[in-house]
Amino acid sequence: MRFVIVTGLSGAGKTQATRTLEDLGYFCVDNLPPKLISKFAEVCTQSGGNIEKVALVIDIRGGIFFDDFFEALNYLKKNEFKYEILFLEATDEVLIKRFKETRRSHPLSPDGRVLTGITQEREKLREVKNIADIIIDTSKYEIRHLREKINKNYGDHTYPEKQLSITVLSFGFKYGIPVDSDLVFDVRFIPNPFYIPELKQYSGNDEPVKDYVLKQEETVNFIEKLVDMLRYLIPNYIKEGKSQLIISIGCTGGRHRSVAIANEVYERLNKENYNSKIEHRDVAEDLHKGEKKL
């Protein structure tokens, strides 16, 4: 089990680091009192392998417990429990700017100057910084830079293609574009099986419609170009630290063309070992639109 303790200066990026670790599959706990660290570690080891990656955030708001923190670390060492400490920091100037932008007071100086709180906190955390395994100065970092750094140090690089969760989603434009889409593709230029009497009753999940749609020259060319583009985009999304990608493919009603094409794109990505799933938002809409609603 990988056990990461995240700490550092207020305003240095602990919240964003925690979110990134969560996206990487870590079970994250924020502001656990240091006295409970050893007990928490025991619970994790007794999970039967269900918990493989843990990130525990220790904030200066628990500053009165820092003696307990070092006692907990000694306990972990004595019991041969492996842990890593990630320490985040930034310059005084950058931290002051961040506090002013968020209009927050410093936790160690709620009624005074932000700089006073930063100075006190830096001194309190000196010993923790000295024993940290990784120190990240976020002074010149944008969020994406921090995500990249966290991913580089704590991501699973054995199967990098699994780091991005991909959803291929079919939909009908007449029911609206999915609001959480990252990429939207319009396949209404492809011949519509809806106007072929013997195909109208089926959906893109059924062989007759699937065969008709996928044999169209427009479909063949579109899928090849789309998959080729995704092969370029996905590794770059992973490198940037993106954790989820929703690829929405739409036709008029979301029942025939978009369903067949979304299924094919999903199968292609699946064969290339990407962490992908398929959803059909509107495939049944036309079947039920005539039913009376409660």
Curated annotation (Swiss-Prot):
Q: Name one GO molecular function term.
A: ATP binding
Provide the binding site for ATP: G8, L9, S10, G11, A12, G13, K14, T15
What domain of life? Bacteria
Pfam families noted in UniProt = PapZ_C (PF22740), RapZ-like_N (PF03668)
Q: Which sites bind GTP?
A: D59, I60, R61, G62
| Alphabetical keyword list | ATP-binding, GTP-binding, Nucleotide-binding
> Could you say which protein family the record assigns here?
Belongs to the RapZ-like family.
Function (record text): Displays ATPase and GTPase activities.
Q: Which PANTHER family match?
A: RNASE ADAPTER PROTEIN RAPZ
Name the chain's protein: Nucleotide-binding protein Cbei_4857
Protein source organism? Clostridium beijerinckii (strain ATCC 51743 / NCIMB 8052)
- High-level lineage: Bacteria, Bacillati, Bacillota, Clostridia, Eubacteriales
